[in-house]
Amino acid sequence: GTVKSADGKYIPRDFNVSDPNYNQSWREQTMIGYELEHQFADNLTFRQNARYATIKQKYRYLVYANSAANSTVLTRRAQREERTTNEFGLDNQLEYLLETGSVNHTLLGGFDYKTSKDKQLLARGSGSQYDLDWTNPVYGVNVDESTFKTATDEQQNLDQMGLYLQDQMSWNNWEWLVSGRYDWSEVRTNDFTDNSFTQQNDNKFTWRTGLLYAFDSGLSPYISYSTSFEPNLQTNRAPGVAPFR
């Protein structure tokens, strides 16, 4: 809907700017993985988790582009999006239980690795045949995708590795957790609209801590603080423009 009127009228909130003849939302997702655990001793356990995933998406729709002042005719644009993502993740961790005086420790250390490949395609078509009068909408537009122009055609590859160490300490009704992690990442982007290539390498140390007191009544107030790191895979829509940083 609209807040301001156009020629004394308002676009209703349930108005469909797309078209039933060109409106597709399709997604297929496949995942496979495993969880492995081996106990070397009562206080020493090894775990390994792995997962592979494939996600395929296709979208077809019309979007609002612009309109003339005080006009009831909307200029629309037809768009087709296709995206395929392949991901693999592996996590190895070792858990060790020990006591130092009256304090119980649960130590957790590990190494994880993640790799992904993301292919994106966005094509657009425009023309007066997509115009729509919102005061008297007539749907059933015919879209010719052979006239589309490519707006985005790229492939991004991510490799990320991380080392982490955590200690969870228990003393009477107190629980204190402290952990640290260091990440390395590399993002490679191939922009096929202008045959350009960019690469971004980042590394970061992050940490977290939390303190909890468990009352006998079951109430457990806590306080925590954490930092995090996530590689940025987003890129600009404009062809040939370098990725966001």
Question: What kind of feature is each model-predicted range?
Answer:
Residues E35-R51, I55-V63, A214-S217, P221-Y222, ...:
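Membrane-embedded beta-barrel scaffold of Gram-negative outer-membrane proteins
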Residues G1-G8, Y59-N66, Q120-S126, R188-S196, ...:
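Outer-membrane beta-barrel translocator domains and adjoining extracellular loop/strand segments
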Residues T84-T85, G89-L163:
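C-terminal low-complexity, acidic/polar tails when present
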Residues G1-Q39, T54-T85, Y130-A151, Q156, ...:
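Acidic/polar loop-and-plug regions of large Gram-negative outer-membrane beta-barrel proteins
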Residues T85, N104-L108, D112-S116, E154-R245:
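Structural signature of Gram-negative outer-membrane beta-barrels, strongest in the C-terminal barrel
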Residues I32-H38, L90-Y96, L163-M169, T209-Y213:
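Residues on the lipid-exposed face of transmembrane beta-strands in outer-membrane beta-barrel proteins
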